[in-house]
A protein has these predicted regions:
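Bacterial Sec-dependent N-terminal signal peptides
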Residues: 1-30
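Carbohydrate-active catalytic/glycan-binding domains of CAZyme proteins
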Residues: 29-316
């Protein structure tokens, strides 16, 4: 999964937290669009902490989170993350983190990228009892025929597959439109080829079509059905050199931009004329025709591992 040096930066959007008490609080009800109403299967705080610390880091100072994804809605940026705090509390503190107890997601938002409001926990295992875990979310939105904006929140159902939750509000209530993963390691195009079908990255292009990337040890891309909860056509490979995990997909001025985490190898077999990347870094590829495997071009190592900047080495 998209794991995990527990550091936080607005610039890199790598969300985590320091285990310290919070003193500054602001009621979510101050903004009419952020009422703390009762939402099924969402744990909402009575008082929502709102940080005003300098540059706004860490985004949440009272819990561990990771693997952020974000969507803009009505002038606010809504961020969703893996709830590492659930693992921490279940095992009783620090120790080997195998992530198996993480079955929820965290919500927060900001309208200025400095002051962050905590919107509570999405209880994924209550909404979708069939899941094993919920890690590394990816979200997108689209206005549908009913005139409402629909939110589509994809997540890793352990390493085996990718699930999806839907809502007509960025803070829920959320529902599970399927009683199983959207894709998993038994899905044609993934089965027998990828070690994992997790770490989703979703985007909707300027024609309104949804696209999803998944994979661990290899990368796969698929066009989503109009309903955003089905696959439309074959699943195709993206030949991402030394692929490890942490898939994400964006669409920028007609170009599909795929980002991923490179593995820990020494790259003596680096297959491209470009400069070799650094160990376990973030890299990106681009394409105009995403289902044509040969169209994907490796571009650059855009973010080195934290270890290259004097911090501890970690996955991504």
């Amino acid at each position: 999964m998209k794991k995990k040096n527990i550091q936080t930066s607005v610039l890199s959007m790598v969300i985590a937290a320091c285990m310290i008490s919070h003193q500054q609080n602001a009621r979510a009800g101050e903004n009419p669009s952020l009422q703390n109403d009762s939402v099924p299967y969402v744990t909402m705080p009575d008082v929502s902490p709102k940080l005003t610390t300098g540059d706004g880091n860490p985004l949440l100072d009272f819990m561990f989170t990771a693997d952020p994804t974000a969507v803009e809605y009505k002038g606010r940026l809504y961020v969703y993350a893996t709830n590492d705090q659930q693992q921490y509390e279940t095992v009783g503190g620090y120790g080997k983190n195998s992530y198996e107890y993480i079955k929820s997601l965290v919500m927060m938002s900001s309208d200025d990228m400095t002051n962050w409001t905590y919107h509570g926990i999405i209880k994924t295992d209550s909404i979708a009892p069939w899941i094993k875990t919920s890690w590394a979310p990816s979200i997108t939105k689209r206005e549908e025929a009913d005139g409402k904006t629909h939110f589509y929140l994809y997540f890793s159902n352990s390493g085996d597959g990718t699930g999806v939750l839907t809502s007509t509000s960025p803070i829920g209530p959320w529902s599970s439109p399927l009683n199983h993963s959207l894709v998993d390691t038994n899905t044609p195009g993934i089965a027998g080829e990828c070690k994992a079908a997790f770490d989703p990255g979703v985007v909707i292009d300027d024609k309104g079509k949804g696209w999803l990337t998944v994979g661990g040890g290899c990368a796969r891309i698929m066009r989503l059905g109009k309903d955003m909860i089905s696959v439309d056509g074959p699943i195709k490979p993206i030949k991402a050199p030394h692929h490890f995990e942490a898939n994400e997909l964006n669409y920028i001025n007609g170009t599909y931009v795929y980002t991923y985490n490179i593995d820990w190898q020494d790259f003596s077999d680096w297959p491209l004329p470009t400069e070799k990347p650094t160990t376990c870094c973030m890299s990106y590829m681009t394409s105009k025709t995403p289902l044509v495997t040969k169209s994907w071009k490796y571009q650059h190592n855009y973010m080195k591992n934290p270890g290259d900047y004097g911090y501890d080495y970690s996955n991504n």
